[in-house]
Amino acid sequence: MTPTSPSPDLLPTLPDVRGKLLRGAELAPYTWFRVGGPADALFLPADEEDLEAFLKALDPAIPVTPLGVGSNLIVRDGGIPGIVIRLMGKYWGEIEALDGITLTARAGALDLAVAKAAAANGITGLEFLSGIPGSLGGATRTNAGCYGSELRDRLVALHGFRRDGSRVAYRGPGKPGALPEAHFSYRHTDLPDDLIVTRLILEGTGAGDPEAISADIAALQARRAQTQPIKEKTSGSTFANPDPPGTPDQRSAWKLIDAAGCRGLKVGGAQVSPLHCNFLINTGDATAADLEALGELVRARVLENSGVELRWEVRRMGRVQRV
């Protein structure tokens, strides 16, 4: 998570691991846009102990970038320098109910899987996660939310590692305890940049009937399928709404984009979705540069039309490819 790139002689000296360490791994298959260049190396740790040992042994000059399921991300065409760490597989997707209202889940668990696990255990209040594409770790980084709820609303505690391999933990906003408090705002968190989230404890709003909760999730999924381009190569919402939820006369990013005449707008193989214009889609042959250029064009047109400067919600990272 530093801007410096390692010299070529650093990567051959990477620590031994029990998971997988792939040099020069293409990252496009790991992102929902299916674009982007390679990582100098991609590390898929077997478990927390494997991740901890790797970070402690890794040369501090080598940058580290955590990657979730790539649902809210544009990896630039020049790839990502240093080590990309992805928490994936059965271990990192584990979810366990702790009691009738709380559960714990590892950072690689899909948001939808967490919502369904909560439903199966009769825990209400986590249904909104079914509308968030991606994994729990990524949702934490952006304080993801929808349908009137955000991750911070349900967070009891989170655990993870700093870049040097030290273990850290934070309590959720307003939660009691001796741990330092994690601070969140609309689509933002003040957690350290080098933090790799590994596990969370979430609290529902109460107990309910599993079948009724599951029916609510199914209804939210059906609504999402009707209003968002979920079958396309896309991500979550491209831009954050200018106003936080609950703001009187809240302005929506998609309405501003539509009013600026951007619905269906194209740059190369990238397009503003005709179905929901706060989504960019890869029509088949887009590059990361196409997507980013289209996003900037949308921002410019919205600024000219309404005077509002939209803020990217999709993360963009990596090196710009030199032509």
Swiss-Prot record:
The keyword Nucleotide-binding does not apply. This is UDP-N-acetylenolpyruvoylglucosamine reductase. Residues 227-240 have a biased composition (Polar residues). PANTHER family: UDP-N-ACETYLENOLPYRUVOYLGLUCOSAMINE REDUCTASE. It is found in: Cytoplasm. SUPFAM superfamilies: FAD-binding/transporter-associated domain-like (SSF56176), Uridine diphospho-N-Acetylenolpyruvylglucosamine reductase, MurB, C-terminal domain (SSF56194). The gene is murB. Its EC number is 1.3.1.98. InterPro entries: FAD-bd_PCMH, FAD-bd_PCMH-like_sf, FAD-bd_PCMH_sub1, FAD-bd_PCMH_sub2, MurB, MurB_C, MurB_C_sf, Oxid_FAD_bind_N. Its cofactor is FAD. Belongs to the MurB family. The lineage of its organism: Bacteria, Pseudomonadati, Pseudomonadota, Alphaproteobacteria, Hyphomonadales. Residues 35-207 form the FAD-binding PCMH-type domain. NCBIfam families: murB, PRK13905.1. It catalyses: UDP-N-acetyl-alpha-D-muramate + NADP(+) = UDP-N-acetyl-3-O-(1-carboxyvinyl)-alpha-D-glucosamine + NADPH + H(+). Transmembrane segments: none annotated. The active site is at R187, S237, E313. Keywords: Cell cycle, Cell division, Cell shape, Cell wall biogenesis/degradation, Cytoplasm, FAD, Flavoprotein, NADP, Oxidoreductase, Peptidoglycan synthesis. Pfam families: FAD_binding_4 (PF01565), MurB_C (PF02873). GO terms for molecular function: FAD binding; UDP-N-acetylmuramate dehydrogenase activity.
